[in-house]
């Protein structure tokens, strides 16, 4: 490996979605700093924070079709049975909802929790209440995606919060997706809910920190760990 490659690999990439914000903060820093120099340093701090917010690190992804992987970085805020949102079309039977709350310091790149085919994507406008509240899953702006995996259908819902005002989803209906694949982001603090079948063996608890693409939320087969592989992406 060359020296240039070593230097390149030591830096965490920044997602292109963040470029406009980073440039805007830096330009404003120069403009306001010309008026009053302390404002330049304030703006520079915001620019560095913006770079940090839009970081897009590679992850060591466990490749196992029986495992459900966390789609987001953050803290597990809810693990409970509930009926999924009507717009997902997952029926009126209870599923397990796992909620991951992302604060403004979390990495906000969202990843696919399990391989399959995107059956539907449904956007719903709504409020911008605190994403940590239980009612956020019903009343906040959100974007829902249903993945048809070999084990059945799983719902993934991106939920905007009090600060987040922009949900981004790159996946399209009928796309084939794989575990750990990047599929979207939510800008500036938010939550992600995942709805999984009740027969899944849970591997997380409320209060635990989850890492997108790496943390195992649950498994369909307790014996599957013997066949695990990893992918770096």
From Swiss-Prot:
Family matches, as InterPro entries: PS_Dcarbxylase (IPR003817), PSD-A (IPR033175)
Residues annotated with Pyruvic acid (Ser) modification: 190
CC annotations in GO: plasma membrane
Entry PTM: Is synthesized initially as an inactive proenzyme. Formation of the active enzyme involves a self-maturation process in which the active site pyruvoyl group is generated from an internal serine residue via an autocatalytic post-translational modification. Two non-identical subunits are generated from the proenzyme in this reaction, and the pyruvate is formed at the N-terminus of the alpha chain, which is derived from the carboxyl end of the proenzyme.
EC number(s) recorded for this UniProt protein: 4.1.1.65
Catalyses which reaction(s): a 1,2-diacyl-sn-glycero-3-phospho-L-serine + H(+) = a 1,2-diacyl-sn-glycero-3-phosphoethanolamine + CO2
Membrane-related topology note: Peripheral membrane protein
Cofactor: pyruvate
Active site: 190
GO biological process, one term: phosphatidylethanolamine biosynthetic process
Location in the cell: Cell membrane
GO molecular function, one term: phosphatidylserine decarboxylase activity
Pathway(s): Phospholipid metabolism; phosphatidylethanolamine biosynthesis; phosphatidylethanolamine from CDP-diacylglycerol: step 2/2
Principal EC category: lyase
Site residues by UniProt (Cleavage (non-hydrolytic)): 189-190
Record key words, sorted: Cell membrane, Decarboxylase, Lipid biosynthesis, Lipid metabolism, Lyase, Membrane, Phospholipid biosynthesis, Phospholipid metabolism, Pyruvate, Zymogen
Details of cofactor binding: Binds 1 pyruvoyl group covalently per subunit.
Role summary: Catalyzes the formation of phosphatidylethanolamine (PtdEtn) from phosphatidylserine (PtdSer).
Subunit-level organization: Heterodimer of a large membrane-associated beta subunit and a small pyruvoyl-containing alpha subunit.
HAMAP family according to UniProt: PS_decarb_PSD_A
Protein name per UniProt: Phosphatidylserine decarboxylase proenzyme
Organism: Bartonella quintana (strain Toulouse)
